[in-house]
Amino acid sequence: MITQRQKDILNLIVELFTKTHEPIGSKTLQNSIASSSATIRNDMAALEKLGLLEKAHTSSGRLPSQEGFRYFVEHSLNPDSLDEQDVYQVIKAFDFEAFRLGDLLQRASDVLANLTGYTALILDVEPKKQRLTTFDIVKLSNHDALAVLTLDEASPVTVQFAIPKNFLDSDLMTVAKIARERFLNQTVLDIHYRLRTELPQIIQKYFPRTDNVLDLFDHIFNPIFQEEVFISGKIKTLEFAGLNTYQFLENLQSVALEIRQSLPEDELHRVQVADSKEKSLADLTVISQKFLIPYRGFGILTVIGPVDLDYQRTISLINVISRVLAVKLGDFYRYLNSNHYEVH
């Protein structure tokens, strides 16, 4: 347990260090702490013994340890402390007309990366929890067709495909019939299971040759099994992390899995200070927060940066962006209706 003065000293050192990245001495702290330099030095020594501060190699000053940053995040952070200029920049950035859901999510990722200077990711609603509400196949020509899948009433996905050479129009209708009977109102997780277990036997009843039909179903439904991930500032990881981290971020499905596993369902936000189980992120800070996607569930905003990032500003930015984004998404979904399709 630390005293209030020691807590104030730690908070001030974290605040100053994240702005200057220079060791902080007792004389610097005297301007804000109403105590003598000797008293402040004693408190700094006590904080060092507790593992919250570290000695600098090049000066007599101190800097926060990983435990010190964690303590600050858990006990002193004020996520509702917002800078007016940051709020203005966020609102201004979202002052545009979005034609697709992805436009808003990508803009959020871009704004978060630009204002923090770190890597930002936005995750859409987790695929496995969504339900298939409509399914249609539209024939475009004699050679290709379009499958239209709607998830949770407001997230249409289209998949264009080449019609198998041995297919008649009635065969396309049969594919649509099977999909509706077996998959409508089922979760994406259930659909994935049924594609592997029930579907092969069902198709045998309708088609003499099943290989290309199974491949067609896989092609049509594969997009809804993939995470929607919007990333910005990936190149910035090379400034504060190694090549391994950059390469890890190349595989967005693995990144999405790591983010979801690190943020339990019953938590809205989490700050990992050099605490990730993923080796490529183990020496970094990963900040994740859920945000509301109206009518569908929750997405996730994530920032990946160095341990000595500015926690107060970064988390405040995540807060304001999540709020503005939720409002914009609400407006977008109120406008959207069943006749609007997202074409991929």
From Swiss-Prot:
- Cite a single GO MF annotation: DNA binding
Question: What biological-process GO terms show up in the record?
Answer: negative regulation of DNA-templated transcription
Keywords carried by this UniProt record: Repressor, Stress response, Transcription, Transcription regulation
SUPFAM superfamilies recorded for this chain? GAF domain-like, Winged helix' DNA-binding domain
Membrane spanning residue stretches: none
Q: Which residues form the signal peptide?
A: none
Task: Identify its protein family.
Answer: Belongs to the HrcA family.
* Functional description taken from the UniProt entry: Negative regulator of class I heat shock genes (grpE-dnaK-dnaJ and groELS operons). Prevents heat-shock induction of these operons.
PANTHER family the UniProt entry points to: HEAT-INDUCIBLE TRANSCRIPTION REPRESSOR HRCA
The molecule here is called: Heat-inducible transcription repressor HrcA
Task: Supply the gene name.
Answer: hrcA
